[in-house]
Amino acid sequence: MNKILILLLLVSAVLTSHDQVVAVTIKPNLYNINSAPLYFEKFISQYNKQYSSEDEKKYRYNIFRHNIESINAKNSRNDSAVYKINRFADMTKNEVVNRHTGLASGDIGANFCETIVVDGPGQRQRPANFDWRNYNKVTSVKDQGMCGACWAFAGLGALESQYAIKYDRLIDLAEQQLVDCDFVDMGCDGGLIHTAYEQIMHIGGVEQEYDYPYKAVRLPCAVKPHKFAVGVRNCYRYVLLSEERLEDLLRHVGPIAIAVDAVDLTDYYGGVISFCENNGLNHAVLLVGYGIENNVPYWTIKNSWGSDYGENGYVRIRRGVNSCGMINELASSAQIA
């Protein structure tokens, strides 16, 4: 009986208003810096890392050691998130951003998408928790790999959800088609969500993943119009000024592709990130829900770094404080044809 009570105390959970189980965040023990060489060898084995020379291995080890010191510092502060070693642990933050994000910088540019200003107070009566996953309207987490195509993954993630909302069926759309055939955006070198929607309108539609598989590299366009699964009728770019109104928009429209600064997301493991700075937008992700855990309000975001990242591929960031610079004018969604 005592063992059962101890187990129940260690493995606790809370329920949201939609009966979704959310694990309570438990802070881990800090990494012993003196054991960094052992951690590094385990990391190499776990993630099948291969280095071209001993010099490169030493260089990567130094980055790894610096990163676990940073992880310890984050886990020591009064934050509601947990950070751990993951596959990015031998990379600098700039390397992760350069290789695994892909939101284009610079001017927004003119396109056909309608611009909508999202401002003002939210609806008085709105649920404290909401998540499109509870309604089976969000497809599985994907991995963009070392290709700066986050814009394609976030944009098509929103389209996949629109399809599920309309037809009550989940399908995976072809990010590779956008990487290869969207000639306004720059494939693995970056792009914007709303211009991707414009290009889908121009091309005529987008194929499913199994008809145009993802390769994580830009290849000659091989689009097959007779295989189009979804078209875009209208697209929208949102100028976000109010997080309360964004809650309403999310519930009424569906999952929305948003832009964030991903630097503070790289070593995330679980919980709610309370400290996420904005030093420049660089990553596109899919906003799927919001809620409250331990009195901390949060947004739930679907990332494109694989299901072994974060909370099964998802990350939660604090709501109401412009976490990661998410309140900007690059959020987008589309109406399917």
Swiss-Prot record:
Tell me, what is an example of a GO biological process annotation in this record?
A: proteolysis
Looking at the UniProt entry, the stretches that span the membrane are none
Gene3D superfamilies per record: Cysteine proteinases
Q: What residue stretch is flagged as signal peptide? A: 1-16
CDD domains to which the protein is assigned, alphabetical:
Peptidase_C1A
Q: Does Repeat count among this protein's keywords?
A: no
Judging by the UniProt lineage, the source's domain of life is Viruses
Instruction: Name the UniProt key words of this record, in alphabetical order.
Output: Disulfide bond, Hydrolase, Protease, Signal, Thiol protease, Zymogen
Report the PTM annotation.
Synthesized as an inactive proenzyme and activated by proteolytic removal of the inhibitory propeptide.
Query: Which reactions is this enzyme annotated as catalysing?
Result: Endopeptidase of broad specificity, hydrolyzing substrates of both cathepsin L and cathepsin B
The active site annotation covers C150, H283, N303
Disulfide bond positions: C147-C188, C181-C221, C276-C324
The protein's job, in short, is: Cysteine protease that plays an essential role in host liquefaction to facilitate horizontal transmission of the virus. May participate in the degradation of foreign protein expressed by the baculovirus system.
Which family, according to the similarity comment?
Answer: Belongs to the peptidase C1 family.
| Name of the molecule in the record | Viral cathepsin
